[in-house]
Amino acid sequence: MAKGGREKIKLESTAGTGHFYTTDKNKKLHPEKMELMKFDPKARKHVAYKEVKLK
């Protein structure tokens, strides 16, 4: 069987609350860092989430 090309990543809040989401992405097709606007329940507003390495 073929090996999967998707890797798990962590999207961490830039608001400094420590909240994060986990997801996966295809790093061969999209090698750049992901940045999304998502809801931070600790800050109670939409903030930017940046991709960081999942430990």
Swiss-Prot record:
Disordered: region residues: 1-26
Keywords recorded for this protein, A-Z: Ribonucleoprotein, Ribosomal protein
Gene Ontology biological-process annotations: translation
Biased composition (Basic and acidic residues): 1-11
GO MF term (any one): structural constituent of ribosome
Membership in a protein family: Belongs to the bacterial ribosomal protein bL33 family.
Stored InterPro entries: Ribosomal_bL33 (IPR001705), Ribosomal_bL33_CS (IPR018264), Ribosomal_bL33_sf (IPR038584), Ribosomal_zn-bd (IPR011332)
Gene3D superfamilies cross-referenced by the UniProt entry: Ribosomal protein L33
Protein name (database record): Large ribosomal subunit protein bL33
One Pfam assignment: Ribosomal_L33
GO cellular component terms given for this protein: cytosolic large ribosomal subunit
Gene name as annotated: rpmG
